[in-house]
Amino acid sequence: MTEQKYIVALDQGTTSSRAVILDHDANIVSVSQREFTQIYPEAGWVEHDPLEIYATQSSTLVETLAKAGIRSDQIAGIGITNQRETTIVWNKETGKPVYNAIVWQCRRTADTCEKLKEAGLEEYIRENTGLVVDPYFSGTKIKWILDNVEGAREDAEAGKLLFGTVDTWLVWKMTQGRVHVTDYTNASRTMVFNINTLQWDEKLLKELDIPLSMMPEVKSSSEVYGETNIGGKGGTRIPIAGIAGDQQAALYGQMCVEQGQAKNTYGTGCFLLMNTGKEKVTSRNGLLTTLACGPRGEASYALEGAVFMGGASIQWLRDEMKLLADAKDSEYFATKVDTSNGVYVVPAFTGLGAPYWDAYARGTIVGLTRGCGSNHIIRATLESIAYQTRDVIDAMQADSGIKLSALRVDGGAVANNFLMQFQSDVLDVAVHRSKVTEVTALGAAYLAGLAVGFWNGLDELADKAVIDRSFEPHHDEEKRNQRYRGWKRAVKCAQSWAELHDEE
C-alpha cells in the first residue's frame, strides 16, 4: 500500500499567514495561522515587514505539519496564494529588503498616479494592463521605493535589486534565492505588465524609471517553479508548483475555469470575478480587466469588480451604531420584518467602488418614515451588499455580453442565509454556497496538485467543488425591478451629497 500524500497551500494574507494541508479528497487535514504587524508610518500609509511575512509563513508550515503528524516527505507539492499588489524590493546579494513591503491599501503614491494621468497615459494603461491608474497597484510603489530609499536607485541600475509581489518573495526565500518568479495573475496587478503580449511593458517601466532587470520571470499558475528544502540542507526537497493571487485562487477553487463562470467573495469588501476565457474584455463600465487561471492554470482573462463595504457595513452596525451585539445576529433581526419598509442604506463610508468609482460619495440612509425601526435599518444594510453585487454583475454582463447563469459564493458573510436568498432574488440567478469555506487555499492547492500529478485533471477536481446549499430566486420581476430602481435612486443621493457641497 502506498503511503498517503498531501498538498500544502500557503495562504499569505493581509493580516495573517496561514498554512493548510489537504488530502487527496481535498479535505482539510490541518490548518495553522499567525498574525503579523500592521505598520502605519503616516496617515494613509500601510506597510508590512517582509522578514516577518516570511517568518510567520514558514513557521505556520512547520507547525501545521507537526500538528497533523505528517512528515515532510509526505508532501507532494506546495501551492502559494497571496495578498495581491503588495510590493517588496530587496538586495539579491544580501537577501535583505531595502524597505518595508508597501501594502496594497497604501495611498502614498496618489501624486505619482496624478502625474501619469496628466501625462495622458490613462488610456494606454487601461488598454494594455487592464487596470485603472491607482495607488492600489504595484508600479507606483516600486518607483516610490527607488526614489525615496537612499542608494536604491543606484543599486537598481547596477542590477543588484529585485522586485516581487509577496508570492515572488516567498519563493525566492524558500529556494534560497535560486528562483525569481511570479505568475500571470500576480503580474497582472502591477500596472506594468502587458496583458496583451503577456510581457512586462517596457514603455511603462521606462515611464516609472524601473529597470527591467528587477522584474521576475512570469510563468503559468500551475507548474514546478523550484524546490524548497524543509529541514535545511539535506532535508526533504518539495516542489513549489502553484501560484495565484488570492482572488484568482478563490475563482479557481470555486472551479470557475470556463468563460462566463463567476464568484463573489464576501469579506470586508466584496470581490467579484468573472472568467472571460481567451477573450480579453476591456471594460467600459468601471471594472478591471485582469488575468485568471484557465483549466490547466494557463493565463485566461477575467473581469473584476471590488465593492468596498461588504461585511464591513455589518461591523458598522455592531461597533458604531450599536444595533447588534454580534454580526451573526444581523440575520435574526433582518428576518423579524417582512421588508425594509422603503429604507435603503448606501454604505459609501469611503466612497463607492466598482462600477461607480466615486471617491466623494458618502454613506446615506434614505426612505425613513415614522414606522421605521432598527430592524429595518439592519435589513436594509444587508440588502445593500446584494444590491452592490448586482451593480457589478450588471456591469460584467454589459461589458462581456455573457449572461450569468449562476453565482458561486464564499467568504464570511455567506453563512447569512437571509443575505444569500436576497442575493439570488436581486440577481434572478441561483446562488451556490460551497461546502469548503477555504476556497482560496483550495485554489492554490489544486494548481500545485495538478502540476505534480497529485490530481490527474479537472474532472477529478470538479467532483470536489461540493455545494453546501443553493439559493433559487423567488421574487417576481416587477417587484425585483422596482426595488432595484429604488436602490439606484438611493445611490444618486449618496453621490449628490458632495456635489451639493461644491455648489454652495
UniProtKB/Swiss-Prot annotation:
InterPro entries: ATPase_NBD, Carb_kinase_FGGY, Carb_kinase_FGGY_CS, FGGY_C, FGGY_N, Glycerol_kin. It comes from the Bacteria. Sn-glycerol 3-phosphate binds at residues 14, 84-85, 136, 246. Signal peptide: none annotated. Glycerol binds at residues 84-85, 136, 246-247. Its EC number is 2.7.1.30. One of its GO terms (molecular function) is glycerol kinase activity. PROSITE patterns: FGGY_KINASES_1 (PS00933), FGGY_KINASES_2 (PS00445). It is an enzyme of class 2 (transferase). GO terms for cellular component: cytosol. One of its GO terms (biological process) is glycerol metabolic process. Pfam families: FGGY_C (PF02782), FGGY_N (PF00370). This is Glycerol kinase. It comes from Aliivibrio fischeri (strain MJ11) (Vibrio fischeri). The lineage of its organism: Bacteria, Pseudomonadati, Pseudomonadota, Gammaproteobacteria, Vibrionales.
